[in-house]
Amino acid sequence: MTTKEKLLALLEDSKGTFFSGEEIARTLQVSRAAVWKAVNALREDGYTIDAATNKGYRLSPDSDILSPQGIRRFLKPEYRDLDLTVLPTAPSTNALVREKANQGRPEGCVIVACEQTDGRGRYGRQFFSPIDSGVYLSLLLRPTAYSPQQATCLTA
């Protein structure tokens, strides 16, 4: 995990709480300069990171960007190591998961997008999935020995 990803995970886990640059550097085992670079990189990605003298940095409570770190904090511990990709936009999460399946990825690969430009629903019909109106995801499953009735529960 990069310093930027580690910093985002730390800030997401304690959203709204200030951390001094020194405290972050010690926790992530990096220099203060590396912390500063990671903060700026997150800001460039659109995250609202507040900085206050004698308080430090915090992820603004109003920050609402979907991220793997933000999702993982709500997952049960046994699911936190899933292969999780979050994209602002994707042609189709299902098509991307299908590509991963064809590459031999194991069950549990998840693709999440804030928008799909070519989403498909049942029978290949177009699935309208614009930005800011939902979260779209596909999960790679490799079920074995499912009856047609059980498969309906997975696909409906």
Language-model-detected regions and their locations in the chain:
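N-terminal lobe of the biotin/lipoate ligase/transferase fold
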Residues: 2-156
